[in-house]
Curated annotation (Swiss-Prot):
Name of the protein in question: Protein Thf1
Keyword Glycosyltransferase among UniProt keywords: no
Keyword annotations from UniProtKB, A to Z: Coiled coil
InterPro entries registered for this protein in UniProt: Thf1
């Protein structure tokens, strides 16, 4: 029997692929995402699918906003995927393909086609396979991917809570998993996004205030430098005249 990869094994692989330090503001998110992906990857009922990939890509992009340098951000995502024996290009390509197929759909069309077996394209093929799989392993990241699709199809769902909740229930029923679980995951996801945005705003405001303070101090020093220079020139002129 093969040994199951441990969290420590996965973390070791991750830090072997990405060797640079991770900004402390983002480190907790990265490590929590890594552990979440690891636990799913070793679950016997879990099977990678493009909606899950969209959830991973969306979560990473939303929570890593403002990360610098950009090259490190790319390296971190690549390492996350490689650490669980995944392919970052596949994640990005299939996430993009889902979004492209969702464009132009109405929410009614989306709900009507959900769960139909043998649909064309990556979106309907994925949804059909999930609806027909009695052992489908729902995950929070899958929920984020599904939510991303719904927001792409009907952005007004963000503002219309009743409509959003009803849509989430209908979609969950069609794909045969708990709507309560999905709702709780999405509520937490949106709440954490708000908190992260507030934190980044505070940090940016602090940095901006610090920049203004340094600029002000620099301007205050300039007259002193000019005055000192003029004083020195006057002394030199007096000495030369003597």
């Amino acid at each position: 029997m093969d040994n199951i990869r441990t969290v420590s094994d996965t973390k070791r692989k991750f830090y072997g692929y990405h060797t640079r330090p991770i900004n402390s503001i983002y480190r907790r998110f990265v490590e929590e995402l890594l552990v979440e992906m690891h636990l799913l990857s070793v679950n016997v009922d879990f099977k990678y699918d493009p909606i899950y990939a969209l959830g991973v890509v969306t979560s990473f992009e939303r929570f890593m906003q403002g990360y610098s340098p950009e090259s490190d951000k790319t390296s971190i995502f690549n390492a996350l995927c490689q650490a669980v024996d995944g392919n970052s290009e596949q994640y990005h390509q299939e996430a993009e393909a889902l979004i492209n197929e969702a464009k132009g759909l109405s929410i009614t069309e989306f709900k009507e086609k959900l769960g139909q077996e043998g649909g064309d394209g990556i979106l309907w093929g994925t949804c059909g396979a999930i609806a027909q799989n009695p052992k489908f392993k729902y995950s929070r990241l899958f929920g984020v991917g599904l939510y991303t699709l719904l927001m792409e199809i009907d952005p007004d769902l963000v503002k219309e809570e009743d409509k959003r909740n009803q849509t989430i229930k209908e979609v969950s029923d069609a794909l045969q998993f708990s709507s309560d679980k999905l709702q709780k995951d999405l509520d937490l996801y949106r709440s954490n996004l708000d908190k992260m945005q507030q934190l980044l705003t505070v940090i940016e405001d602090t940095l901006e205030a610090d920049r203004k303070k340094r600029a002000s101090q620099k301007l205050e020093k300039k007259p002193e430098v000019v005055e000192e220079k003029e004083h020195k020139e006057n002394e030199e002129q007096q000495q030369s005249s003597n």
